[in-house]
């Protein structure tokens, strides 16, 4: 199958060499034991003086988007200029005030994108701060500064790897040399920005951001030492703070250990009120959001991430999840996600990455319950909340959100109550009744809901899929002949019943006051200009036979009751032909 690609002698030889693939794979697969290979990757970090577990977050940290750089570099097909611009505008519209826009030294397109933002009036609002990123090298720092020339304000971000392993393996320099390189980077950055001889450059309000890659695997003592050197060189103030950034890079520990590291660093930075601490977590172990949340308690001032968790490998921290976690704890996150499905659509179109349907908040199934027990609890909670609002008598828990199995109000992310219940073979009467209530405005009695839910389950099993709300409502109208009955006059109905030989004719007589037979009827008003009443008749034809349900709508309560019994007769007796009434 792959032979056409084996065009060189080397490839041909490799293809014909026995076991050449297993030999390569052993580099990753051979291990004497789990403990030897993976044990002690993260050094113990005893920190008994920790205070973050006792803290409660009261206000949101600044949320910082890295979608245009960290997110973009992780895509199989990087964004075009137009796509980056569309995503940038989306981020601004959502409410992000600090956005990383480019890596100017990467290529000309990155540089040109920054220039376009700065040179196009209105693209950078007065309260939005853009950030450019560069390695800690003279030419690249200079290039980054050139890219934002003329901006009213900008963040210049440079970084160095910080763990002993990375410094020894990749940089091959001592700790002293590493600290000196960081100090030099801060000094050089200041010399060509705040202290530049160019008045145009000096007119920009500069913020310097120095970052530590692989922070989670670094020694805190070394990080503190380097931070002090960088801070002293840049010389920030309370009014013009600098930023110290720490990145887990590859998530290495549990979130509580990361929080200990953050608190230790935060508490040991001199003149802490002149420094903002920003945290950049990754999701390699699945704990990016948890690590960021605990870091917020431990002293982080800014939290970095991408929409929907885009990013290298398992992704950066999901800004949507973090923000809505804040919202559902009563904290305004600072960004507007009230049209989340629209935001997701733009993201998916641009990145070509689908958001998993089970993703917290943004997934298509996040609010949807299929289980009958869950649906019943949701419908009862929503009915209680609705009735409390309509009657003007708030319950003890309102206006607080306390609906079982719904972590937030669907309206807060731009969804409707139609999204909370999915109907399939696992659904129960509560879910089916809720869908009919939303779609048709009918408040089904429990017995009718139970009976109809069985019919719905049979249909779902037959089709082998979920039934849409419209399908459920149409099935209800068909099952109980609701629309046909509503189209006929009372006289036609009476005559139609009298023409049948059904023993249930007397039940109709009871409804209109002509006789007394077994028929239990409930009713309620409708919010409809024409048909103002709905009635539900539970008719028992004979003692030995099960009861039958019918549904009727009418301009009067009497008419609705009449039609409900006729509906039950139609369900029970095939001899009753509506064709003759056409």
Curated annotation (Swiss-Prot):
Residue ranges of every copy of the Pyruvate carboxyltransferase domain listed in the record: 61-341
Keyword Transferase tagged: yes
GO biological process per UniProt: L-leucine biosynthetic process
Reactions that this protein is recorded to catalyse: 3-methyl-2-oxobutanoate + acetyl-CoA + H2O = (2S)-2-isopropylmalate + CoA + H(+)
Transmembrane portions of the chain: none
Pathway this chain belongs to: Mycotoxin biosynthesis
Keywords: Transferase, Virulence
One protein family per Pfam: HMGL-like
GO CC terms, sorted: mitochondrion
EC number(s) on file: 2.3.3.13
GO molecular function: 2-isopropylmalate synthase activity
Induction: Expression is up-regulated more than 10 fold in toxin producing cultures.
SUPFAM superfamilies documented for this protein: Aldolase (SSF51569), post-HMGL domain-like (SSF89000)
Family matches, as InterPro entries: AIPM/Hcit_synth_CS, Aldolase_TIM, LeuA-like_post-cat, LeuA_allosteric_dom_sf, PYR_CT
Task performed by this protein: Isopropyl malate synthase; part of the gene clusters that mediate the biosynthesis of AM-toxins, host-selective toxins (HSTs) causing Alternaria blotch on apple, a worldwide distributed disease. AM-toxins are cyclic depsipeptides containing the 3 residues 2-hydroxy-isovaleric acid (2-HIV), dehydroalanine, L-alanine which are common for all 3 AM-toxins I to III. The fourth precursor is L-alpha-amino-methoxyphenyl-valeric acid (L-Amv) for AM-toxin I, L-alpha-amino-phenyl-valeric acid (L-Apv) for AM-toxin II, and L-alpha-amino-hydroxyphenyl-valeric acid (L-Ahv) for AM-toxin III.
Family: Belongs to the alpha-IPM synthase/homocitrate synthase family. LeuA type 2 subfamily.
Further remarks about this protein from its record: Gene clusters encoding host-selective toxins (HSTs) are localized on conditionally dispensable chromosomes (CDCs), also called supernumerary chromosomes, where they are present in multiple copies. The CDCs are not essential for saprophytic growth but controls host-selective pathogenicity.
Protein name (database record): Isopropyl malate synthase AMT7
Organism of derivation: Alternaria alternata
Name of encoding gene: AMT7
